[in-house]
A protein has these predicted regions:
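Catalytic Zn2+-binding segment of zinc metalloproteases
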Residues: 65-83
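Short, solvent-exposed loop/turn segments at secondary-structure junctions
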Residues: 40, 47-48, 67, 76, ...
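Short pre-active-site segment immediately N-terminal to the catalytic Zn-binding motif
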Residues: 40-62
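Short, mixed-charge, low-aromatic patches
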Residues: 13-18, 57-64
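Short, surface-exposed, polar/charged, turn-prone segments marking secondary-structure boundaries
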Residues: 41, 69-71, 89
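Auxiliary, metal-adjacent structural segments of Zn-dependent hydrolase domains
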Residues: 1-44
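Metalloprotease/metallohydrolase-associated module, dominated by Zn2+-dependent proteases
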Residues: 4, 23-31, 80-145
Length: 145
């Protein structure tokens, strides 16, 4: 049970990456937090037990991932996955940038992360450079109103 700013009290399902058959086929995600079908998987170097034991240390990240849980519930996780992962081919990923802008805007609003840091993160290799900075700024502004 986590009490996350902007979400209230939530029952989050956090599991080790090894429990996901899908993540076994996506080793490039091992260093990132990943949310699939309402389940949050911490990076490979961190266990679900460690996340539970250190609770508030991960609140802003869990709040960010909780936004993705809501997005997947709203769209269905197969559609979310299609938009987030597959439709960027051959280049750019405006849907990925949109999903991340909403989640990072939540972090900025409720946890004090700067908008600059959020845009830098979204426009980085972590997200495979999904969109031009000006577009990500526009998306962030839409969510931060």
């Amino acid at each position: 049970m986590a009490n996350l700013r902007g979400h209230g009290t939530l029952e989050l399902d956090v599991r080790d990456r090894a429990s996901s058959w899908l993540l076994r086929f996506a080793p490039w995600t091992n260093k990132a937090w990943t949310t699939i079908n309402g389940v949050i998987y911490p990076p490979l170097a961190l266990s679900a037990e460690q996340v539970a034991a250190h609770g508030s240390r991960y609140d802003s990240t869990l709040a960010h991932e909780a936004v993705h849980v809501r997005q997947q519930a709203r769209l269905s996780w197969p559609l979310f996955l299609l938009l987030y992962v597959l439709l960027p081919i051959p280049f750019l990923a405006p849907a990925r940038a949109w999903f991340e802008a909403e989640a990072y805007a939540h972090e900025a609003e409720h946890y004090g992360r700067s908008a600059d840091a959020c845009v830098d993160a979204i426009c980085s290799r972590l997200y495979v450079y999904p969109a031009p900075r000006w577009l990500v700024w526009w998306m962030m502004a839409r969510f931060m109103q």
